[in-house]
Amino acid sequence: RWIKQYYGLSIPEDAMDEDIEESARFYEEDNGELHIRSDFLIADEDEPRTVRCAFILNLQNADLRSMGVLFSIHDEDVPVFRLLRLRARRAPGLLEDAKAVLLKLFDADAEYSADTLENIYDKLEIAGKLVLSGDVTDAMAGEVLGAIARQEDLNGRIRRNVMDTRRAVSFMMRSKMLNAEQFEEARQILRDIDSLDSHTEFLFEKINFLMDATVGFININQNKIIKIFSVASVALLPPTLIASLYGMNFQYMPEL
């Protein structure tokens, strides 16, 4: 209510709805307000997730105090926002206007995704060394499978997140809201995102390989156990057979 009274801006009731259609997430109102709803990654170790953020930007209606002010609505703090605030304090001239703020947020989100991918590489390298060592128990294999599955989930979230960032940046470029320098920066962000796509694809292949290798070691261990039981059964067969023969009653067998 305060925002509407002071800035003349109405926050849509469905600002945080989980819409999938692009037309419902990136659009321009008749009054010139730009609406962008985009997801930002939180690579939490225990609960990785994406957070929906809604942005509203008035670039045309100079009669309102909201002119040139970027409004953001989100349910929790996002690492990318904290990172940009820190950079802005260190370099006051970094953000020249609201459009630059929005663009830098998407740039930082792509950078954050890249850093998270590097962390996934490190985690998978540790798992790979353990699996390929050949000395893996079932308990160790179970832990490795759990670790690999968590990295697969995070990798999938990154892939979806950068896809969403690409759509948001492309919308900003199509809306003709960026100056020449900002437009070139947006193109660079898209190039960075394209490079991340190949990394996520490679990680999916590596994850599948490690999962297959781990499951293979589990099967080998199980086959060893079955073989031990089979040998034990054969070794115990003669005494069992003799005991059975001695336990038979031959008196009423006509063949004898």
What are these language model-derived features?
Residues 194-256:
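Hydrophobic alpha-helical transmembrane segments and their immediately adjacent juxtamembrane loops
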Residues 168-183, 210-221:
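Long amphipathic alpha-helical coiled-coil segments
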Residues 138-139, 176-182, 247, 252-255:
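Conserved catalytic-core motifs characterized by acidic clusters
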Residues 1-174, 178-179, 188, 192-195, ...:
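Peripheral, non-transmembrane regulatory/ligand-interaction domains of membrane transport proteins
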